[in-house]
Curated annotation (Swiss-Prot):
Enzyme class: transferase
Binding site for dimethylallyl diphosphate: R105, K187, Y189, R251, K253, Y255, K332, Y334
The organism of origin for this protein: Gibberella fujikuroi (strain CBS 195.34 / IMI 58289 / NRRL A-6831)
Protein name in the entry: Dimethylallyltryptophan synthase 1
Gene name linked to the record: DMATS1
Reported phenotype of the disruption mutant: Impairs the production of r-N-DMAT and ac-r-N-DMAT.
UniProt entry tagged with the keyword Transferase: yes
Effect annotated for changing Y389A: Reduces the catalytic activity when DMAPP and L-Trp are used as donor and acceptor, respectively; and almost abolishes the activity when GPP is used as a donor or L-Tyr as an acceptor
Catalysed reaction, written as an equation: L-tyrosine + dimethylallyl diphosphate = 4-O-dimethylallyl-L-tyrosine + diphosphate
Binding site for (2E)-geranyl diphosphate: R105, K187, Y189, R251, K253, Y255, K332, Y334, Y404
NCBIfam families the UniProt entry points to: arom_pren_DMATS (TIGR03429)
Amino acid sequence: MLLQASQATQSVWKTLNKWLPPLSRDKDWWWKTLGPQINTLLTEADYDLNERYEALLLLYRWVVPEMGPRPRSSVAPSKSFMTDDHSPIEYSWKWISGNKKPEIRYAVELVSPLAGSKQDPFNQIPTRNLVYNLAKIIPELDLTWFEHFWHELLGPGSPTTSTSGVLTKGSTVFAALEMLHGHLSVKVYFIPVETPDFSAWHQIKHAIEASGCPNLEALNHVDAYLSSHDDGRQLRPFMLAIDLVEPAASRLKIYARSNQTSFRFVRDVMTIGGLRTDLDRSIEKFSDLWKRALGLDPDTPPEDELPKVDHLTSGAVFNFDVAPKSQIPEVKAYIPVRHYANNDLQAALGLIGYLEDHGHGGYSQSYLRGLDMLAPSGQLDQATGVQTYFAVACQGEDLSLTSYLNPQFYAAFQEPERT
């Protein structure tokens, strides 16, 4: 049974909406849709008043004006990589151990009015402008690696310029705004355009090697795993993410996908083929969470594959952090609840049951209220789609967990996918 949200939840957004200058029709729709959603998530995660005002003003000033046309049908005008229905924004809720306040983030692909044209064939201009504008306001942002990886992966000589007359089917860059309690952190994702001669992995690896990174040991471990290990060869890298901080402090996250879905495979990737040997206890916990989140029988053998799903984003997803501060990559796996759970409520209750059993369930009802706010009315226990992934990283004997949430702006025009 969901607890009812406080009547005061939207007071911050209502105050801002009352006094901020009016927006044009499309921008007004985005503001009146995203604003209450973000405000609800921040309120449920116990962000203080000033943090909520700042997050909403950032949204109003720098994000909403570049969101593009409002949804008018099930067909998105820009095929954003962000979500399965091409909604250009995805929220995340990071669970903090010890019942501490969760952290809220959203990743967003801004939409250029020139997207698909010769001037901006890969819809890159607004994200680049967002980064530059935020850097003027937040002096701690460091653009050293942003400039480097933009040049290497999207700049002159990259496939995005050599094929600039061709319309892209997907995204090449987007940003994430991490609203940590007390400050804002920014991350940028690069998705190289693959060609017959240059895979995404080839481009990402070369860009990291050319970055001046003082320690490539973690990268070399990933390269060896991908090329020489049976399970590693089942992975296809497709994206790189960096933090906008000084390079020595930044993460370097290489994202990879596989159509393999057994927990045995997931365990092998998490340990990098046995390279990491200190994860037995956390992997045991991960196995328990995997079964709960996906509604599997507790006795399901780790060799069993999940049911086959024919979709571009089906399968398992991972990221490898090859930052210079690490000699062995940190690995994160993404439980694909969007495609394999029974419904959103089942997946959420599986996650919450795990958290409560391990003493981390203090924000369970807050999370459920957030889901209820995002889900189409009456659909939380009828379909999947709001929760896309549960991200899992092994930290000592415990797990670090993050839920990813899709507001489904375009799916709202479709018949729900009932399970």
